[in-house]
Amino acid sequence: MKNVGIKKAALQMSRYVLASKQVQRALKLLGLPASRANEVSGIPKPADTSLSFPGYEAFALHGEAWQAAGEQKPIILMFGVHPWKRDVLARYFSDFRVAYVRTNTSWTKVQTSFCQFTPQAFVFWGMTEIRAAKNYAIKSSIPLWRVEDGFLRSVGLGAQHVLPLSLAVDTTGIYFDPSRPSTLETLISEIGVTENATLIERARRCMSMISAFGLSKYNVGQDVPLKRLPPSDRRRVLVVGQVEDDASIVMGCAARYTNNDIVRITQKENPEAEVIYRPHPDVLGGHRKEFSNPRDVANICTILSGDYDLGSLLDSVDHVYTITSLLGFEALIRRKKVTVFGAPFYSGWGLTDDRQPTPRRTRKPSLDELFAAAYILYPRYCVGSLGSSAEIEHAIMSLALEKNGVPRELAEGVSSALPAEAINVDCVSQTLEGLKSIPS
């Protein structure tokens, strides 16, 4: 077993060194500064991730903050985080020493460790929580935070262990639970109180890049336009299928709708339109439970079962119906009409056709303001040599490059070498062309 570990570490180090050299070479040929290109987050720099200290046996300790230089940093406890993403998540919390509660560790064992330290916060992944831990935190006035993947995550799925470029950290609630306030909801409510022309300009620049390069949360699928469908002069209305027992629906929708319910409502409300139904890929692939069979509505809609690029799909329709899917907001970015039956973070602000009341959401922000709150102010980004000091522009550029065939390590290295304010559609396009012209 020891030899296997040594070989794995050696392989990781060789990949890291190769990626770093590739980034340095590309930056030099592109005429970009290369001083920070010795760090690559797509392949994390090899580190001792098996740190252990007396009294901390209940925890997996990850991150450079556990080294001597960070020994005075406060400690946060993280619950429900899979081992494969612990290293990269620690980079998002560089101001803390991150202690991950090991799987199947009893709360009693965790609590006995508190004689060694007082946690700065308890951090839960999504809605995963240990009741005893939550009660202890409330009783002891320890802040409760929740984390989830950000809205511009990666090229590839988390289920495939693709590491995230962004993380939503919520110190109040979580964005997909409308039953209570969240940090995101507060940001949206307050963003228009003080005019910030620079922030709005950034929002517009970022939305233009997202649209130009067809970016979405996961950026999976081939660039397949809808020209393969039968020609039609009718309006096209897209129904976005979701995993029907997903937390965003269970918590975000007061009524209980199936995907087929939404298809039938869409057809009834748009009898003259061509209704296009995209079932969720995880349901089609048998990875998540199917509650409604798409074949039952095949007579009233066109069902997409292919590997369609979501950006191309949204560009090809006029109107989107969904329960709570983020694809609804991605449609708003592309100036499409959106109808929602639940209460996702972007509903209730006057920008969508809402079928569920959201009484706390009384402001009427512009789309630019809503985007700025949700994509610029709310998430944390972690890209290349910048680590958690990266901005949304770095993530957008990295995703655009990788989606167009640039290896992730190179995409992150090049993107993180540029100042955020210099990144726009032309910059990304020119960099992409430059990278394609570099001999391999």
From Swiss-Prot:
Protein name per the record: Lipopolysaccharide-processing protein LpsZ
Taxonomic source organism: Rhizobium meliloti
Annotated function: Involved in the invasion of nitrogen fixation nodules. May be involved in the biosynthesis of lipopolysaccharides as an enzyme or a regulatory protein.
Originating gene: lpsZ
Keywords: Cytoplasm, Plasmid
InterPro entries xref list: Capsule_polysaccharide_synth (IPR007833)
Protein family per UniProt: To E.coli capsule polysaccharide export protein KpsC.
GO biological process: polysaccharide biosynthetic process; polysaccharide transport
Cellular localisation: Cytoplasm
Higher taxonomy: Bacteria, Pseudomonadati, Pseudomonadota, Alphaproteobacteria, Hyphomicrobiales
Gene Ontology, cellular component aspect: cytoplasm
